[in-house]
């Protein structure tokens, strides 16, 4: 079901990109699950109906979901939404983990252009992580289009392979939490 959520979002983003809309805030917090467990993209507050958008005003931005070119040059395209999709896919697989946990925004500005990327979640299949890595390529034109991402995720769904190992996830969900904390 987790990969189906990702496939639903990719299909929705393919539609938006065909209409030349840039979402600019694609994240798990902006995906709603509706009837029949269909994931739908929400919160279009930062979206723009342009092929390329250059931000020229100040304001709060979702830094942990932003592509390198958006962080460095305030340039947003469908390919920067693809980067954000890779982060969203990481969120789905990690069952709501915080992207770049423990890193400051300043560290992201410094490390992402140097090639740093989030590690593969322990419960994540190599093929899913490779898709994330494709979304996080330095050069926007090297990132896959949403049409390709959608096809890839649907193909994975049809393979009926365990791309997210829930048994492994249970082994580290609460690691490092003091058992006596519940009693306090």
Curated annotation (Swiss-Prot):
One of its GO terms (cellular component) is plasma membrane. Disruption phenotype: Increase in the number of apln expressing endothelial cells in intersegmental vessels at 48 hpf. In a decreased flow model, there is an increase in gaps in the dorsal longitudinal anastomotic vessel with fewer lumenized segments at 2 dpf. Significant reduction of parachordal lymphoblasts at 2 dpf and loss of brain lymphatic endothelial cells at 3 dpf. Increased apoptosis and reduced directional migration of parachordal lymphoblasts both dorsally and ventrally along the arterial intersegmental vessel from 2.5 to 3.5 dpf. Keywords: Angiogenesis, ATP-binding, Cell membrane, Kinase, Membrane, Nucleotide-binding, Phosphoprotein, Receptor, Transferase, Transmembrane, Tyrosine-protein kinase. It holds the Pfam family PK_Tyr_Ser-Thr. Expressed in most populations of endothelial cells in 24 hours embryos, including the endocardium. One of its GO terms (molecular function) is transmembrane receptor protein tyrosine kinase activity. It is a single-pass type I membrane protein. It is an enzyme of class 2 (transferase). Coiled coil: none annotated. The modification Phosphotyrosine is found at residue 53. Its EC number is 2.7.10.1. Gene3D superfamilies: Transferase(Phosphotransferase) domain 1. Belongs to the protein kinase superfamily. Tyr protein kinase family. Tie subfamily. This is Tyrosine-protein kinase receptor Tie-1. It comes from Danio rerio. The lineage of its organism: Eukaryota, Metazoa, Chordata, Craniata, Vertebrata.
């Amino acid at each position: 079901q987790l990969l189906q959520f990702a496939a639903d979002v990719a299909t929705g983003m393919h539609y938006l990109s065909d209409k030349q809309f840039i979402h600019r805030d694609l994240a798990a917090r902006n995906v709603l699950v509706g009837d029949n467990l269909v994931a739908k993209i929400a919160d279009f507050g930062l979206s723009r109906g342009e092929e390329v958008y250059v931000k020229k005003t100040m304001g709060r931005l979702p830094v942990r979901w932003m592509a390198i070119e958006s962080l460095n040059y305030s340039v947003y395209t469908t390919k920067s939404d693809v980067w954000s999709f890779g982060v969203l896919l990481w969120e789905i697989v990690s069952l709501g983990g915080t992207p770049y946990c423990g890193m400051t925004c300043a560290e992201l500005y410094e490390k992402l252009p140097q090639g740093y990327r989030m590690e593969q979640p322990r419960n994540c299949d190599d093929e899913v992580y490779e898709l994330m890595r494709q979304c996080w390529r330095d050069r926007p034109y090297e990132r896959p289009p949403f049409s390709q991402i959608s096809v890839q995720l649907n193909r994975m769904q049809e393979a009926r392979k365990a791309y997210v190992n829930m048994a492994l996830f249970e082994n580290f969900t609460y690691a490092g939490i003091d058992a006596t904390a519940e009693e306090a």
